[in-house]
């Protein structure tokens, strides 16, 4: 494929940032399910032993949060809701049958919902996780607070897992999306179809640099 037929969607640092977050999520989610459901205790072996999993789980969670915060500051301005997103949401039936609508920028309304849901649930996980983190912080809180934090942590964890499952499904559903995060590039045709406004902005910037 000729270079002019592709567009850089994610740079190497952006992709590394994404996959660090993804790797930490897998470790935290799998070990967390082992904590939450007794029948899934064997999942904790992903970190070695159940005892080691209980020690490492919160540290992995902190790394995941820190990594996602970097992503947040990189992309928050691309995820602000606008009129095109409302139009996109109103035509969700067309989206389901793989028909693109509206003048979508770098991210569509669905991707923006995933982004904001992820940051909300990650904040809840961090706050509740700190409260229940033994032996460092839990002793500073009362039993009722710890119990509430445990429920909140469990809810936020399951909710985030669902959000990420939707994220993965959408990435697999839209052909060419995985390539963007693995290799960093997308075809011009892909960009024109799925993110026309972003495509025009990138082309305009590229043309200015070439002058």
Curated annotation (Swiss-Prot):
<feature type="binding site" description="axial binding residue">
    <location>
        <position position="18"/>
    </location>
    <ligand>
        <name>heme b 1</name>
    </ligand>
</feature>
<feature type="binding site" description="axial binding residue">
    <location>
        <position position="167"/>
    </location>
    <ligand>
        <name>heme b 1</name>
    </ligand>
</feature>
<dbReference type="InterPro" id="IPR006471">
    <property type="entry name" value="Formate_DH_gsu"/>
</dbReference>
<comment type="subunit">
    <text>Formate dehydrogenase is a membrane-bound complex, formed by subunits alpha, beta and gamma.</text>
</comment>
<feature type="binding site" description="axial binding residue">
    <location>
        <position position="57"/>
    </location>
    <ligand>
        <name>heme b 2</name>
    </ligand>
</feature>
<dbReference type="GO" id="GO:0005886">
    <property type="term" value="C:plasma membrane"/>
</dbReference>
<feature type="topological domain" description="Cytoplasmic">
    <location>
        <begin position="73"/>
        <end position="112"/>
    </location>
</feature>
<dbReference type="GO" id="GO:0009326">
    <property type="term" value="C:formate dehydrogenase complex"/>
</dbReference>
<keyword id="KW-0479">Metal-binding</keyword>
<dbReference type="GO" id="GO:0045333">
    <property type="term" value="P:cellular respiration"/>
</dbReference>
<dbReference type="GO" id="GO:0016020">
    <property type="term" value="C:membrane"/>
</dbReference>
<comment type="similarity">
    <text>Belongs to the formate dehydrogenase gamma subunit family.</text>
</comment>
<keyword id="KW-1133">Transmembrane helix</keyword>
<feature type="binding site" description="axial binding residue">
    <location>
        <position position="153"/>
    </location>
    <ligand>
        <name>heme b 2</name>
    </ligand>
</feature>
<feature type="transmembrane region" description="Helical">
    <location>
        <begin position="54"/>
        <end position="72"/>
    </location>
</feature>
<dbReference type="InterPro" id="IPR016174">
    <property type="entry name" value="Di-haem_cyt_TM"/>
</dbReference>
<keyword id="KW-0813">Transport</keyword>
<dbReference type="GO" id="GO:0009061">
    <property type="term" value="P:anaerobic respiration"/>
</dbReference>
<feature type="topological domain" description="Periplasmic">
    <location>
        <begin position="131"/>
        <end position="151"/>
    </location>
</feature>
<feature type="transmembrane region" description="Helical">
    <location>
        <begin position="18"/>
        <end position="32"/>
    </location>
</feature>
<dbReference type="GO" id="GO:0006788">
    <property type="term" value="P:heme oxidation"/>
</dbReference>
<dbReference type="Pfam" id="PF01292">
    <property type="entry name" value="Ni_hydr_CYTB"/>
</dbReference>
<dbReference type="GO" id="GO:0015944">
    <property type="term" value="P:formate oxidation"/>
</dbReference>
<dbReference type="GO" id="GO:0046872">
    <property type="term" value="F:metal ion binding"/>
</dbReference>
<feature type="topological domain" description="Cytoplasmic">
    <location>
        <begin position="171"/>
        <end position="211"/>
    </location>
</feature>
<dbReference type="InterPro" id="IPR011577">
    <property type="entry name" value="Cyt_b561_bac/Ni-Hgenase"/>
</dbReference>
<comment type="function">
    <text>Allows to use formate as major electron donor during aerobic respiration. Subunit gamma is probably the cytochrome b556(FDO) component of the formate dehydrogenase.</text>
</comment>
<keyword id="KW-0812">Transmembrane</keyword>
<keyword id="KW-0349">Heme</keyword>
<feature type="transmembrane region" description="Helical">
    <location>
        <begin position="152"/>
        <end position="170"/>
    </location>
</feature>
<dbReference type="GO" id="GO:0009055">
    <property type="term" value="F:electron transfer activity"/>
</dbReference>
<feature type="transmembrane region" description="Helical">
    <location>
        <begin position="113"/>
        <end position="130"/>
    </location>
</feature>
<keyword id="KW-0997">Cell inner membrane</keyword>
<feature type="topological domain" description="Periplasmic">
    <location>
        <begin position="33"/>
        <end position="53"/>
    </location>
</feature>
<protein>
    <recommendedName>
        <fullName>Formate dehydrogenase, cytochrome b556(fdo) subunit</fullName>
    </recommendedName>
</protein>
<dbReference type="GO" id="GO:0006974">
    <property type="term" value="P:DNA damage response"/>
</dbReference>
<dbReference type="GO" id="GO:0008863">
    <property type="term" value="F:formate dehydrogenase (NAD+) activity"/>
</dbReference>
<dbReference type="InterPro" id="IPR051817">
    <property type="entry name" value="FDH_cytochrome_b556_subunit"/>
</dbReference>
<keyword id="KW-1003">Cell membrane</keyword>
<dbReference type="GO" id="GO:0019645">
    <property type="term" value="P:anaerobic electron transport chain"/>
</dbReference>
<feature type="topological domain" description="Cytoplasmic">
    <location>
        <begin position="1"/>
        <end position="17"/>
    </location>
</feature>
<keyword id="KW-0249">Electron transport</keyword>
């Amino acid at each position: 494929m000729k270079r002019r037929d592709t567009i850089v969607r994610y740079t190497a640092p952006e992709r590394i940032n994404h996959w660090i977050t993804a790797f930490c999520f897998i470790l935290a989610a799998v070990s967390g399910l082992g904590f939450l459901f007794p029948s899934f205790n064997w999942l904790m072996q992903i970190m070695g032993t159940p005892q080691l999993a209980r020690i490492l789980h919160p540290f992995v969670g902190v790394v995941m949060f820190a990594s996602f915060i970097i992503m947040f500051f990189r992309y928050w301005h691309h995820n602000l809701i606008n009129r095109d997103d409302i139009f996109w949401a109103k035509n969700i039936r067309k989206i389901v049958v793989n028909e693109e609508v509206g003048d979508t920028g770098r991210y569509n309304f669905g991707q923006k919902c995933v982004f904001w849901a992820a940051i909300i649930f990650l904040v809840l996980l961090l706050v509740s996780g700190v409260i229940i983190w033994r032996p460092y912080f839990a002793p500073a809180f009362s039993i009722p607070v710890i119990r509430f934090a445990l429920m909140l942590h469990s809810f936020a964890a399951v909710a985030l897992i669902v959000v990420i499952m939707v994220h993965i499904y959408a990435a697999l559903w839209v052909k060419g999306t995985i390539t963007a995060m693995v290799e960093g590039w997308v075809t011009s045709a892909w960009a024109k179809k799925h993110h026309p406004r972003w495509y025009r902005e990138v082309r305009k910037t590229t043309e200015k640099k070439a002058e």
